[in-house]
Amino acid sequence: MSTSKKIKQRLKDAGKRFWAGDNISDFIEDGEKQQLIDELAPKFEEVLQGLVIDTENDPNSNGTGKRLAKMYINELMAGRYEPMPVATAFPNDSIDRYEGMLVVRSELTSMCSHHHQIVRGVAYIGIIASEKLIGLSKYTLSLIHI
């Protein structure tokens, strides 16, 4: 049975949906992300062949099926296959504490769950400082899960 079918079966057995925008990381076992990439690579190769692209002789297209599989799993849809980052709150009580509003600018590359095409944008996250703050990088890392 293929890795994707095993994961789908686990999701179905647990009564969980697996729509394009859903995070399914709790149902992926160690090593299965790489197995999904290996499973997808020849399928992406078939898509390229269907588009009449010479993936054997065109040096730019040689190995592109594998690169596409890696890009979808590890980058464009990373929020689907990776758990949400753990955010630790730190005391904001030192002499150099933050006061007022902090603004985090984050460039975002994701995927439209309807057209499955790349979406790029910029998010500005405003944080009102209080007694505790989470690390600023966690706000950016959390964006891939939205």
Residue ranges and their predicted role:
Residues S2-V122:
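Active-site loop/lid in soluble adenylation, ligation, and acyl-transfer enzymes
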Residues I144-I146:
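Conserved small/polar residues in nucleotide/adenosyl-binding loops
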Residues I125-S142:
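Histidine/lysine/aspartate-rich catalytic loop segments that bind and position anionic ligands
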